[in-house]
Curated annotation (Swiss-Prot):
CDD domains: homeodomain
Record PTM text: Ubiquitinated in s SPOP-dependent manner; leading to prteasomal degradation.
UniProt keyword list: Activator, Diabetes mellitus, Disease variant, DNA-binding, Homeobox, Isopeptide bond, Nucleus, Phosphoprotein, Transcription, Transcription regulation, Ubl conjugation
Protein name: Hepatocyte nuclear factor 1-alpha
Classification of source organism: Eukaryota, Metazoa, Chordata, Craniata, Vertebrata
Assembly information from the UniProt record: Binds DNA as a dimer. Heterotetramer with PCBD1; formed by a dimer of dimers. Interacts with PCBD1. Interacts with BHLHE41. Interacts with NR5A2. Interacts with SPOP; this interaction promotes ubiquitination and degradation of HNF1A.
Effect of residue 142 to F: In MODY3; reduces transcription activation by about 80%
Impact after mutating residue 257 to W: Reduces transcription activation by 70%
Outcome when changing residue 190 to Q: No effect on transcription activation
Transmembrane segments: none
Stated consequence of mutating residue 246 to D: Reduces transcription activation by 75%
Residue ranges, annotated region (Disordered): 40-81, 183-205, 283-358, 545-567
GO molecular function list: DNA binding; DNA-binding transcription activator activity, RNA polymerase II-specific; DNA-binding transcription factor activity; DNA-binding transcription factor activity, RNA polymerase II-specific; protein dimerization activity; protein heterodimerization activity; protein homodimerization activity; RNA polymerase II cis-regulatory region sequence-specific DNA binding
Length: 631
């Protein structure tokens, strides 16, 4: 009999009394153990079952009592479980078997969680994997790990097997280091135990002490020589011996954990491979085009024929959102020197302004991006790349008088070329174009329409490094002075006929905040051939457009008829006809507001009537000799 009950016994007694069992019935059941022990097959009443619980409580402090052992021998599957390591005690000498049983009995009497932490610390100190414990004891790997790491309860029989292995391993390791210090064979003590380990040797595992030494050496030298590796071997083995609490002279007792020169070589090789892999992974991560706002990259200035430049990355432009996927178009541009054609292929991204209907778009996939000898093109999605024209395009700095034409289906940059090449260069079938002409004697910022919502809303200034010559003093481009002599041209966007019309379903045109932003000359014409735009005299014409009556508009004709614009020139040799590539649609593409077109001969007051604040008109400058033959 024990003089004092444990906490578990006290809780069990309290549970028995709370279940309705009286103290007298409990004492009576304890006084009659015979019927209780033989009642395993028959039905038991409360007194007998509770008495059985009390009978087991008396033997709990012994730890290895027969009653408790019979309880723990039953595994989860209901079968008797006897660890194989306990059966091996019979093979030992009686003195050794008695010693191990005594030590295991002592460990079983202690706190299981404290003993579990002690066993785990020993495994870490000697770099012993849990697999070796599982192979020797027959315990479940998961159950053993949870017991050592979290203190999960384990039955006494299984804990006895774990503690038996722990005691035996301590003895085995001590013998290894002892024989290593004496110069004897270290395999003799473990030779008889090889069958219990299922013939498997422990895999080498780097200890924390050795890893610290190796990482410090790797920082100094990533590929040490053989002499340096041998020095590291001695340092690692010394650290491993100190970690185990033995003398460095007994390093041979480390067994499978002995550090060798080959293992050090492999460790450094693996570290170099890992570093190279991480470097390659980082390079692959940052090698792609960096996403973010800003103008997309321009086409390379030194593109060779037949080699398409890299695709333009889509850029986020203020007021513009990207819609349909990009398609690629190819345009052939005659060079100014009469050389071979230069073919450039670049994607035109379908974009739509924020104020436009989903069915509309600013840049159609039908357009072509034309590049000439003047230099690289600005991105298709925006004209703001012209800000960096001086820094990024030396070729354009030398020839600042390039004509930049922008129509809604596309954007074109045309450099100085031969007169014969102007015709195919300026041909942009299927679109009308808003062309802004300039005449000034000073270097100035040219406004370029950058973003379009329900109307032309944003004027983006573009700084030119050299002054533009006035129309009555110098020609725009000497090679083509007989065809374009009145003024230099800077082009921006507009569209009067297209399935993706800009002003469809918009009641009125919004105003500009500034009325003097644009220079002196603006005209609306078809751009199939601009060679006839010469020697135009100033006057004023007013075109009115109605969304319902297309016959009243000078800009709309029925779909079954074609429109021809005749622009006479002072030079009879340069008189040509501008034929639109497509028939103008009768569908409402412009609001019912009137379209007033001016041209002023005086350059000083020309900006005062351009784009007034009235929402119902757009005032631009146009020639008097432009006529519309609406049929």
């Amino acid at each position: 009999m024990v003089s004092k009950l444990s906490q578990l016994q006290t809780e069990l007694l309290a549970a028995l009394l709370e279940s309705g069992l009286s103290k007298e019935a409990l004492i009576q059941a304890l006084g009659e153990p015979g019927p209780y022990l033989l009642a395993g097959e028959g039905p038991l009443d409360k007194g007998e079952s509770c008495g059985g619980g009390r009978g087991e409580l008396a033997e709990l402090p012994n730890g290895l009592g027969e009653t408790r052992g019979s309880e723990d021998e039953t595994d989860d599957d209901g079968e008797d479980f006897t660890p194989p390591i306990l059966k091996e005690l019979e093979n030992l000498s009686p003195e050794e078997a008695a010693h191990q049983k005594a030590v295991v009995e002592t460990l079983l009497q202690e706190d299981p969680w404290r003993v579990a932490k002690m066993v785990k610390s020993y495994l870490q100190q000697h770099n012993i994997p849990q697999r070796e414990v599982v192979d020797t004891t027959g315990l479940n790997q998961s159950h053993l790990s949870q017991h050592l790491n979290k203190g999960t309860p384990m039955k006494t029989q299984k804990r006895a097997a774990l503690y038996t292995w722990y005691v035996r391993k301590q003895r085995e390791v001590a013998q290894q280091f002892t024989h290593a210090g004496q110069g004897g064979l270290i395999e003799e003590p473990t030779g008889d135990e090889l069958p219990t380990k299922k013939g498997r040797r422990n895999r080498f595992k780097w200890g924390p002490a050795s890893q610290q030494i190796l990482f410090q050496a790797y920082e100094r030298q990533k590929n040490p020589s053989k002499e340096e590796r041998e020095t590291l071997v001695e340092e690692c083995n010394r650290a491993e011996c100190i970690q185990r609490g033995v003398s460095p002279s007994q390093a041979q007792g480390l067994g499978s954990n002995l550090v060798t020169e080959v293992r050090v070589y492999n460790w450094f090789a693996n570290r170099r491979k890992e570093e190279a892999f991480r470097h390659k992974l980082a390079m692959d991560t940052y090698s792609g085009p960096p996403p973010g706002p800003g103008p997309g990259p321009a086409l390379p200035a030194h593109s060779s024929p037949g080699l398409p430049p890299p695709a333009l990355s889509p850029s986020k432009v203020h007021g513009v959102r990207y819609g349909q996927p990009a398609t690629s178009e190819t345009a052939e541009v005659p060079s100014s020197s009469g050389g071979p054609l230069v073919t450039v292929s670049t994607p035109l991204h379908q974009v739509s302004p924020t104020g436009l209907e989903p069915s509309h778009s600013l840049l159609s996939t039908e357009a072509k991006l034309v590049s000439a000898a003047g230099g690289p093109l600005p991105p298709v999605s925006t004209l703001t790349a012209l800000h960096s024209l001086e820094q990024t395009s030396p070729g354009l700095n030398q020839q600042p008088q390039n004509l930049i034409m922008a129509s809604l289906p596309g954007v074109m940059t045309i450099g100085p070329g031969e007169p014969a090449s102007l015709g195919p260069t300026f041909t942009n079938t299927g679109a009308s174009t808003l062309v802004i002409g300039l005449a000034s004697t000073q270097a100035q910022s040219v406004p370029v329409i950058n973003s379009m919502g329900s109307s032309l809303t944003t004027l983006q200034p573009v700084q030119f490094s050299q002054p533009l010559h006035p129309s009555y003093q110098q020609p725009l481009m000497p090679p083509v002075q007989s065809h374009v002599t009145q003024s230099p041209f800077m082009a921006t966007m507009a569209q009067l006929q297209s399935p993706h019309a800009l002003y469809s379903h918009k009641p009125e045109v919004a105003q500009y905040t500034h009325t003097g932003l644009l220079p002196q000359t603006m005209l609306i014409t078809d751009t199939t051939n601009l060679s006839a735009l010469a020697s135009l005299t100033p006057t004023k014409q007013v075109f009115t457009s109605d969304t319902e009556a297309s016959s009243e508009s000078g800009l709309h004709t029925p779909a079954s008829q074609a429109t021809t614009l005749h622009v006479p020139s002072q030079d009879p040799a340069s008189i040509q006809h501008l034929q639109p590539a497509h028939r103008l649609s009768a569908s409402p593409t412009v609001s019912s507001s009137s379209l007033v077109l001016y041209q002023s001969s005086d350059s000083s007051n020309g900006q005062s009537h351009l784009l007034p604040s009235n929402h119902s008109v757009i005032e631009t400058f146009i020639s008097t000799q432009m006529a519309s033959s609406s049929q």
